[in-house]
Amino acid sequence: MRDKLLPRQLCAQPCRLAFRWPGDKKASHPLSLKDLSLAGQLERLKEMGVACLKLEGRMKRPEYVAVVTKIYATALKEGREPTGDELAQLEAAFSRQGFTQGYYRDQKGPAMFGTRPEGTKDPEELFAQARA
């Protein structure tokens, strides 16, 4: 795996690969965590003194970054958590069978794992709005 790392030691995402265990007929994704999302914890994070948020967007489309940053920025500016509709937009923009708060809430376990179903298409209508 080390030989395949990109310049500047960027991640080659082995956690997203399928593995087949000896004796198994089908490969699975035993290392693939759902995306961590603390969108519903913005006010709590602010109270804790968090002054900066990191968005994992290195391998995502620019429209994804636009959708996510708009939702977070609007919610923070208005001093509120994202609405249900905004949370649905976040999930539509990109998620692996939903999001997890597992490490933040110390709820580690199988519910933290998920994959993006094969053939999932990008939400072009949502992304078109981001481009407008």
What are the roles of these predicted feature ranges?
Residues 1-132:
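Surface-exposed amphipathic alpha-helical tracts and adjacent flexible/coil segments at the periphery
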